[in-house]
């Protein structure tokens, strides 16, 4: 995996609060927070549908991941997903000694369990910590970075294209930001439409906006505020 930019300082103890927009609707809220946990870093994420969208499709997701803060190699990630009538708890542990990703999943509604093991290289990132990892890289328009990502199944190589530097206005402020597009030929990003993330062009490199063009419409997450504590 490409190394973080020299001098990068993780945005510890900052809760990033996002508002979600789908078509003309306020679709919900999401949060991201990174904090120190002993010798590791911990990232906590949430996503909740609200308003009319919640009536149409219930969403209440919770994520927690632990990683090595120097190289962003993921240690484990837990996901509690409530989406529609589906409720699934997932834990993925990365055993670098055995070079395996161990997935344990429990479908609460169906009372079914699943255990799988898949090969991994000497360092991988997960779907949540990858958001911060990309921000740690020396982003400049025209650059491309590649890294392995694992979400419990087969490890995939993700290509990150830095497309442009542009101004982004958010309720949290106006930022100059790098527009980044991730692509992968298979795995968790395949058939997900087109995705973009805008990272602030400053020392924090926080994701100030995220957008996905999917078959069911465009979903945009825009930074509303930063809670520092």
Q: What feature does the model see in each segment?
A:
Residues 1-96, 133-229:
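Acidic, serine/threonine-rich low-complexity disordered tracts
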Residues 88-134:
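Hydrophobic, well-structured mid-protein blocks that either form specific transmembrane helices
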């Amino acid at each position: 995996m490409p190394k973080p930019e020299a001098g990068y300082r993780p945005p510890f103890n900052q809760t990033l609060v996002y508002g979600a927009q789908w078509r003309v609707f306020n679709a919900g809220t999401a949060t991201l927070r990174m904090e120190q946990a002993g010798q590791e870093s911990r990232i906590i994420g949430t996503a909740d549908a609200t308003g009319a969208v919640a009536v149409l499709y219930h969403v209440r997701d919770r994520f927690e991941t632990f990683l090595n803060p120097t190289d962003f190699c993921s240690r484990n990630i837990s996901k509690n997903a409530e989406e529609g009538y589906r409720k699934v708890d997932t834990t993925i542990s990365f055993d670098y000694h055995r070079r395996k990703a161990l997935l344990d999943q429990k479908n609460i509604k169906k009372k079914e369990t699943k255990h799988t093991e898949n090969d991994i290289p000497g360092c991988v990132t997960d779907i949540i910590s990858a958001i911060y990892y990309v921000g740690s890289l020396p982003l400049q328009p025209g650059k491309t970075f590649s890294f392995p990502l694992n979400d419990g199944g087969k490890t995939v190589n993700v290509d990150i294209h830095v497309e442009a530097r542009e101004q982004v206005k958010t309720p949290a402020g106006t930022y100059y930001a790098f527009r980044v597009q991730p692509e992968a030929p298979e795995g968790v990003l395949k058939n997900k439409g087109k995705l973009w993330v805008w990272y602030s062009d400053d020392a924090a490199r926080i994701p100030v906006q995220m957008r996905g063009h999917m078959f069911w419409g465009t979903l945009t997450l825009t930074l509303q505020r930063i809670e520092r504590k």
